[in-house]
Swiss-Prot record:
Gene name, Swiss-Prot/TrEMBL: IGLV6-57
Function comment: V region of the variable domain of immunoglobulin light chains that participates in the antigen recognition. Immunoglobulins, also known as antibodies, are membrane-bound or secreted glycoproteins produced by B lymphocytes. In the recognition phase of humoral immunity, the membrane-bound immunoglobulins serve as receptors which, upon binding of a specific antigen, trigger the clonal expansion and differentiation of B lymphocytes into immunoglobulins-secreting plasma cells.
Segments of this protein annotated with the region Disordered: 65-97
Spans annotated as Framework-3: 73-110
Record note on quaternary structure: Immunoglobulins are composed of two identical heavy chains and two identical light chains; disulfide-linked.
Region annotated Framework-1, chain positions: 20-44
Intracellular or extracellular location(s): Secreted; Cell membrane
Species per Swiss-Prot/TrEMBL record: Homo sapiens (Human)
Record-annotated Ig-like domain positions: 20-117
An individual GO BP term: adaptive immune response
Alphabetized SMART domains for the sequence: IG, IGv
UniProt protein name: Immunoglobulin lambda variable 6-57
Keywords on record: Adaptive immunity, Cell membrane, Disulfide bond, Immunity, Immunoglobulin, Immunoglobulin domain, Membrane, Secreted, Signal
Length: 117
């Protein structure tokens, strides 16, 4: 995949205060079609509220696509079954997918960046 080396290069050059803000998410979650699932992403230090969180969906054999940006915004074409939220009290972000469909089976990644820039 041509994008993988570029992505690794960009991550290797991440500098600044936000580079020290680490997010942790569960290894896997599962639920039945038609149900609702929530995937959480917890910040290790600092305040998640001072960072924007994005969520990516990666289906097998495909490049990642953005499903949520700036904490809770959906790109054009992403169904409203996908929603994002921030919980400052637990220093975490969540991606919620309602009305699960088989096509939602994928890897999901959270990523943050400094919202002041």
């Amino acid at each position: 995949m041509a994008w993988a080396p570029l992505l690794l290069t960009l991550l290797a050059h991440c500098t600044g205060s936000w580079a020290n803000f680490m997010l942790t998410q569960p290894h896997s979650v599962s639920e039945s079609p038609g149900k609702t699932v929530t995937i959480s992403c917890t910040g290790s230090s600092g305040s998640i509220a001072s960072n924007y969180v994005q969520w990516y969906q990666q289906r097998p054999g495909s490049a990642p696509t953005t499903v949520i940006y700036e904490d809770n915004q959906r790109p054009s074409g992403v169904p409203d079954r996908f929603s994002g939220s921030i919980d400052s009290s637990s220093n975490s972000a969540s991606l919620t997918i309602s009305g699960l469909k088989t096509e939602d089976e994928a890897d999901y990644y959270c990523q943050s960046y400094d919202s002041s820039n």
